[in-house]
């Protein structure tokens, strides 16, 4: 019988141990039992969560928001298996101190705590809050992104080539929401053979995920040829079976393409029928509107060159149903048997779809974006990954009705149209950059129509219409009943607005007639696919709350502008710049970070200010972060613009 340990002699006196535990600067937590009740916390933990009475409470009751973020699943695994686990820069969202839910990042180690007989009584954690480190890196990455051309030149050429060969975006269509993520393997950042595609064809949407055997530049070259061949067949109107048969014949001319796998699916927008073929590829995961998840039946088709043919199966997708295509890197993860890994993928996707899992602060995002990004992040961060991972997700939705606005040709018409158009474009799922471009073009059209209306009769009004077609194009028009108004040659800003509108959208036309003027635009909508090298940490995109009311704050040598700068507010800004700069004699900085719309009249005022400063030998510095409406427009008209730190843009608000 083993002698009982002399704790005081072996470990130290209880009071000394407690005092040392208390003063260790790292967060230390002891949990007990299968419900992970808090039994010990040190001063560092209490300083981290000062208002929470945790000792004696189950962890899930103290931090309920963490349910579904995979931290409790990790604690369960350590308690059940006795195997230590760790996490690096895990993003966790919960109420840490009673002040509301917030997002922080952590490094941690979880280890089992055993009784004298070897059985596990609980787990303990060593935790380091690394939020400051992560956010500093995010800020640095944002600055690198601002210098994107220089950054691209120093990146690995194979990675650059692969991203150039992959689909950079997914379409926006009336009957479905789509999202895509591509994760580059941490230990092999060279190009690989994974790819995805989404093609909007009017009456149907075709989704593709494929995987070529091998890695590196050779695999990427094979992938690009197969992707192009399949796109050509699908775009030409061939069925899933016909397209795959053609690619199977073509692959014989492409060394290294044998045994490539593909999953191709076609959604009929009207009926919801989803026809698919799993050509040697893992079957898609179907997540229904009521948040149940199951894998669809494989079709029995083999990879390219297998000679099995390409039989198809069909599912009917209801409104709210989602389908997830993926490559094997998602389910073949280190330390997980394939059966357990596939079940974990389905369970996690179902919990995120139901709202019980995932990140609570991500809720404002589109459901399909949360399903795609949260699933990828939460699934992989506890195991890591050895291969590139592609995840392409689509959720069927009811189409948004077309937009129709009729209003009088008054000075506030453009502002009214911008507000309604922004809301409609956001509802159909347009990306913020497309929203800015279309809103800008239509606003210029409306302002021209107002001038026509003032020349005749305001009550004749303006009609604005917009609709999203099944091919992913928005078609919009502005119709007025006024007469075209000529402008004096050389008048500042005249003619610039229509030229800018034509440059911002895919196609624009203006037709004049005796009964008025019709301005139309066509613009293909897309949302960027997300390419990442680290699933733990996502880079924050530029975001701004839409407050279109024009406000300008004048400080010493600095003007901060917010809201819409259009034909009704540009004159105010012009006067403020002239006064603050003393007509160009004094240097001035104009912060346009919070500008929601920069029309041609505003561009004219800024161009004039820069011209005055240049003539006087001083500076007029325009500030706007990359991705903002002002930065986009100023880059288009080639006015020099300086980026800003997006974390500080709204600090004073």
From Swiss-Prot:
<keyword id="KW-0479">Metal-binding</keyword>
<feature type="binding site">
    <location>
        <position position="211"/>
    </location>
    <ligand>
        <name>Mn(2+) 2</name>
    </ligand>
</feature>
<keyword id="KW-0904">Protein phosphatase</keyword>
<keyword id="KW-0597">Phosphoprotein</keyword>
<keyword id="KW-0808">Transferase</keyword>
<keyword id="KW-0067">ATP-binding</keyword>
<feature type="binding site">
    <location>
        <position position="328"/>
    </location>
    <ligand>
        <name>Mn(2+) 1</name>
    </ligand>
</feature>
<feature type="modified residue" description="Phosphoserine">
    <location>
        <position position="600"/>
    </location>
</feature>
<keyword id="KW-0418">Kinase</keyword>
<dbReference type="InterPro" id="IPR013656">
    <property type="entry name" value="PAS_4"/>
</dbReference>
<dbReference type="InterPro" id="IPR036457">
    <property type="entry name" value="PPM-type-like_dom_sf"/>
</dbReference>
<dbReference type="InterPro" id="IPR002645">
    <property type="entry name" value="STAS_dom"/>
</dbReference>
<dbReference type="Pfam" id="PF01740">
    <property type="entry name" value="STAS"/>
</dbReference>
<feature type="domain" description="PAC">
    <location>
        <begin position="86"/>
        <end position="142"/>
    </location>
</feature>
<protein>
    <recommendedName>
        <fullName>Multidomain regulatory protein MT1410</fullName>
        <ecNumber>3.1.3.16</ecNumber>
        <ecNumber>2.7.11.1</ecNumber>
    </recommendedName>
</protein>
<dbReference type="Pfam" id="PF08448">
    <property type="entry name" value="PAS_4"/>
</dbReference>
<dbReference type="GO" id="GO:0004722">
    <property type="term" value="F:protein serine/threonine phosphatase activity"/>
</dbReference>
<feature type="domain" description="STAS">
    <location>
        <begin position="546"/>
        <end position="653"/>
    </location>
</feature>
<dbReference type="GO" id="GO:0046872">
    <property type="term" value="F:metal ion binding"/>
</dbReference>
<keyword id="KW-0723">Serine/threonine-protein kinase</keyword>
<dbReference type="InterPro" id="IPR036890">
    <property type="entry name" value="HATPase_C_sf"/>
</dbReference>
<dbReference type="InterPro" id="IPR000700">
    <property type="entry name" value="PAS-assoc_C"/>
</dbReference>
<dbReference type="GO" id="GO:0005524">
    <property type="term" value="F:ATP binding"/>
</dbReference>
<dbReference type="GO" id="GO:0004674">
    <property type="term" value="F:protein serine/threonine kinase activity"/>
</dbReference>
<keyword id="KW-0547">Nucleotide-binding</keyword>
<feature type="domain" description="PPM-type phosphatase">
    <location>
        <begin position="177"/>
        <end position="396"/>
    </location>
</feature>
<dbReference type="Pfam" id="PF07228">
    <property type="entry name" value="SpoIIE"/>
</dbReference>
<feature type="binding site">
    <location>
        <position position="212"/>
    </location>
    <ligand>
        <name>Mn(2+) 2</name>
    </ligand>
</feature>
<dbReference type="Pfam" id="PF13581">
    <property type="entry name" value="HATPase_c_2"/>
</dbReference>
<dbReference type="InterPro" id="IPR000014">
    <property type="entry name" value="PAS"/>
</dbReference>
<dbReference type="InterPro" id="IPR035965">
    <property type="entry name" value="PAS-like_dom_sf"/>
</dbReference>
<feature type="region of interest" description="Anti-sigma factor kinase region">
    <location>
        <begin position="397"/>
        <end position="544"/>
    </location>
</feature>
<dbReference type="InterPro" id="IPR036513">
    <property type="entry name" value="STAS_dom_sf"/>
</dbReference>
<dbReference type="InterPro" id="IPR001932">
    <property type="entry name" value="PPM-type_phosphatase-like_dom"/>
</dbReference>
<keyword id="KW-0464">Manganese</keyword>
<comment type="function">
    <text>Primarily acts as an independent SigF regulator that is sensitive to the osmosensory signal, mediating the cross talk of PknD with the SigF regulon. Possesses both phosphatase and kinase activities. The kinase domain functions as a classic anti-sigma factor-like kinase to phosphorylate the anti-anti-sigma factor domain at the canonical regulatory site, and the phosphatase domain antagonizes this activity.</text>
</comment>
<feature type="binding site">
    <location>
        <position position="211"/>
    </location>
    <ligand>
        <name>Mn(2+) 1</name>
    </ligand>
</feature>
<dbReference type="InterPro" id="IPR052016">
    <property type="entry name" value="Bact_Sigma-Reg"/>
</dbReference>
<feature type="binding site">
    <location>
        <position position="387"/>
    </location>
    <ligand>
        <name>Mn(2+) 1</name>
    </ligand>
</feature>
<keyword id="KW-0460">Magnesium</keyword>
<keyword id="KW-0378">Hydrolase</keyword>
């Amino acid at each position: 019988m083993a002698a009982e340990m002399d704790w005081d002699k072996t470990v130290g006196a209880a009071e000394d141990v407690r005092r040392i535990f208390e003063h260790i600067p790292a967060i230390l937590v002891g949990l007990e039992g299968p419900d992970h009740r808090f039994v010990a916390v040190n001063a560092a933990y209490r300083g981290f969560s000062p208002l929470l009475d945790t000792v004696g409470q189950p962890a899930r009751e103290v931090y309920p928001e963490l349910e579904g973020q995979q931290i409790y699943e990790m604690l369960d695994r350590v308690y059940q298996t006795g195997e230590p686990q760790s996490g690096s820069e895990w993003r966790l969202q919960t109420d840490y101190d009673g002040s509301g839910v917030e997002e922080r990042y952590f490094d941690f180690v979880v280890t089992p705590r055993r009784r004298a007989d070897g059985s596990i009584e609980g787990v303990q954690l060593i935790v380091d809050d690394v939020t400051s480190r992560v956010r500093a890196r995010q800020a640095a990455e944002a600055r690198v992104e601002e210098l994107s051309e220089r950054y691209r030149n120093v990146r690995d050429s194979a990675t650059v080539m692969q991203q150039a060969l992959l689909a950079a975006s997914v379409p926006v269509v009336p009957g479905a929401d789509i999202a895509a993520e591509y994760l580059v393997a941490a230990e092999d950042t060279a190009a690989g053979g994974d790819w995805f595609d989404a093609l909007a064809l009017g009456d149907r949407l075709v989704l593709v995920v494929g995987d070529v055997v091998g890695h590196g530049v050779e695999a990427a070259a094979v992938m690009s040829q197969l992707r192009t061949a399949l796109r050509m067949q699908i775009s030409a109107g061939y069925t899933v079976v016909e397209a795959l048969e053609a690619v199977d014949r073509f692959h014989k001319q492409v060394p290294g393409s044998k045994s490539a796998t593909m999953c191709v699916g076609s959604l009929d927008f009207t009926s919801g029928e989803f026809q698919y073929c799993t050509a040697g590829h893992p079957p898609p995961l179907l997540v229904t509107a009521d948040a149940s998840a199951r894998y669809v039946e494989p079709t029995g088709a083999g990879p390219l060159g297998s000679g099995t043919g390409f039989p198809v199966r069909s599912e009917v997708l209801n409104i709210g149903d989602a389908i997830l295509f993926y490559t094997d890197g998602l389910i073949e993860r280190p330390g997980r048997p394939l059966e357990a890994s596939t079940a974990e993928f389905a369970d996690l996707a179902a919990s995120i779809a139901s709202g019980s899992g995932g990140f609570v602060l991500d809720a404002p995002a589109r459901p399909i974006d949360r399903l795609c990004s949260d699933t990828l992040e939460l699934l992989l961060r506890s195991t890591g990954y050895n291969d590139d991972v592609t995840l392409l997700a689509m959720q069927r939705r009811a189409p948004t009705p077309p937009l129709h606005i009729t209003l009088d040709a008054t000075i506030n018409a453009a502002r009214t149209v911008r507000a309604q158009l922004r809301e409609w474009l956001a509802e159909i799922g347009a990306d913020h950059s497309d929203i800015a471009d279309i809103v800008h073009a239509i606003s210029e059209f409306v302002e021209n129509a107002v001038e026509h209306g003032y020349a005749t009769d305001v009550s004749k009004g303006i009609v604005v219409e917009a609709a999203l077609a099944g091919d992913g194009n928005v078609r919009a028009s502005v119709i007025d009943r006024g007469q075209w108004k000529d402008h004096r040659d050389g008048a500042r800003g005249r003619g610039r607005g229509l030229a800018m509108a034509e440059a911002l959208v895919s196609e624009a036309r203006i037709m004049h007639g005796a009964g008025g003027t019709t301005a139309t635009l066509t613009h293909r909508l897309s949302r960027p696919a997300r390419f990442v090298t680290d699933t733990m940490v996502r880079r924050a995109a530029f975001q701004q709350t839409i407050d279109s009311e024009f406000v300008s704050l004048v400080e010493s040598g600095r003007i901060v502008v917010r809201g819409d700068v259009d034909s009704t507010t540009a004159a105010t800004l012009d006067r403020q710049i002239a006064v603050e700069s003393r007509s160009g004699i004094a240097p001035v900085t104009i912060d346009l970070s919070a500008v929601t719309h920069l029309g041609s009249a505003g561009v004219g005022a800024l161009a004039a200010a820069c011209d005055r400063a240049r003539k006087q030998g001083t500076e007029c510095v325009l500030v706007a972060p990359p991705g903002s409406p002002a930065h986009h427009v100023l880059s288009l008209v080639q006015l020099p613009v300086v980026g800003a730190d997006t974390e500080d843009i709204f600090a004073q608000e």
